[in-house]
Structure formats: C-alpha cells, structure tokens
Amino acid sequence: VERLVEKGGPSRYVSNYAVAGVSAFSTRLLDLLEKYGTMEQTIEKMIEEKMTVTAVVWEKEWAEFTWPWDILKANRLVVDNLLKGKGSFIAESADVHNSAVLEGPVYIGKDVVVRPGATLRGPVYIGNNVYVGNNALIRDYASLCDGVHIGYAVEVRNSMIFDKVNVGRMTYIADSIVGANSCIEAGAQMWNWRPGKKPLFIDDDGEKVQIPFRKFGAMIGDNVVLGVNSSIYPARRIGEGSSIAPGCVIDQDIPPYSEVSVKQVLEIRPISEETDQCE
C-alpha cells in the first residue's frame, strides 16, 4: 500500500480498491494511533516511516455502511446469498398454518408462528421466535430478526426490523429500518415516497444529502415507542429512546430521548336529544 485517500466524488477517484474495514497490525499501531488520532492518519504515518503495509484483496461481494439506506442494501445482499438458487428453508420447529401463503424463497427460523391468512412473499427472512399474525403481508426483502411480533393485517416491505420489535395491527412499514426493542403501535404508517417522483433528502449536519432511491421510509432507533395511528413522513429519523404520542404526524427528525405529542383542542357543542345520530 502506497497511500490512503479519503473517499470522495468522481473527481477524486484514484483507485479500484477500497478499505473494507478489517485490519491486522503490530502493537506499534497503538502508539501511533494515540498520537495521530485517526486510523487513516496513523496508517499514512506508518507508510511514511517505511513500515510494511500490505493489503489482501477480497474478491467476493461486500457492503459499505455510510448511510442508513446502506442497511437495506446490505440486507438485500445477505438475503440473496441466503436464498437465491437454494429455495426456501423452514425450520422443523416452525408452526406455519396451512392456510398461510408462501410465495417465492423464504427463510423461516426456529419456533416461528405464522397464523392463518398470512402471506410471505419472498425473498423474505424470518428469524427465530417470530410471530406473524393473521392476514399479515411480509414481502419483497422484508427481514424480521429474532423475537419480532407482527400483529393482524400488518404489511412489511423491503424493511429491516431488528430484534424484539412489537408491531401492532394494521401498521404499514415500507423501505424502513426499525431498531431493536421498539414498539410500533396499531395503525402506524411509514410513508416512503413523495408525490410527483420528487427526490428524497436527509439532513447531514446542515447539508442536504439526496437519497439514491425514489422510495425510502423511516429510520427508527432502538427502544422507540411509536404511538397508535401516528404517521412518519419519508426519510425522517426518530432517535433511540424516543416516545411518540398517538396521532402524531412526524414531518421532521426527532432527536434521541425525546417525548413528542400533538396539541389538540376539542370542540363540544350541545345537540338536541331528539337528533337521530344514525340517520
């Protein structure tokens, strides 16, 4: 290795190779790292001091994690490698009702329960100890990690739902990421596109970054409570530990450990006792 260059746009393209993140160095690295602060600067200094720095070429597929949507790209890579050309896998301990519909390749882990009327339209990954309720639709690269609970008539599409998430009935999750131990209550909706095919952006320290997909939903951290009938605009982030009250419409990013509610004013007017309310 002659030098390292921080990645940038096409104008800074200098090599066909990228650092994939796995390294092995002598303990000398620790002394230099304490002095120079970053791994990149430290390796550059080792090269300047004529220390031997070599690279091993990884010739298989790999996934880079820079932006939240990279999780969905990596999920597709993993699911494809797990299922494509191999057919479906269903663990012996899984309880899949005979009226459930399985289409395309699906992976179903240990002690999974799939209730009557549910549809799994692959490619789909279902981890261990997952419950999929009646009439749920899990499709198109949806991945449910261990211990996830999916309620009645929930739809999940192209999303990554991490361990022990509880999703209430009639919720819609598409092109989204839901962190572990979160509770998505009944009727929550995660919008994933803007009308007119308008591009989607996220804010990165004050700079707008365009998302490279027309559809992208919510990014929800660990231990979040998303209240009944709440809705999230496309490409919005909810930080870990936050609590969203029922009925909120989330049109901006929510910082970690925030409590969000909506102000409501009830108007109560008298009506005649003779009024037939069902007419």
Q: What are the residue ranges of the model-derived segments?
A:
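Short, well-ordered turn and helix-capping elements at secondary-structure junctions
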Residues: 5-8, 78, 98-100, 118, ...
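Catalytic-core segments of class I nucleotidyltransferases/pyrophosphorylases
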Residues: 2-83
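Glycine-rich hexapeptide-repeat left-handed beta-helix
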Residues: 151-279
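A short acidic/small-residue loop/turn micro-motif
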Residues: 9-10, 86, 104, 122-126, ...
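Long, charged amphipathic helices and adjacent flexible linkers at domain junctions
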Residues: 78-100
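Periodic glycine anchor positions in long extracellular repeat architectures
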Residues: 91-94, 109, 127, 179, ...
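Acidic, glycine-rich loop-and-beta core segments that form the ion-binding/anion-interacting portion
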Residues: 97-155
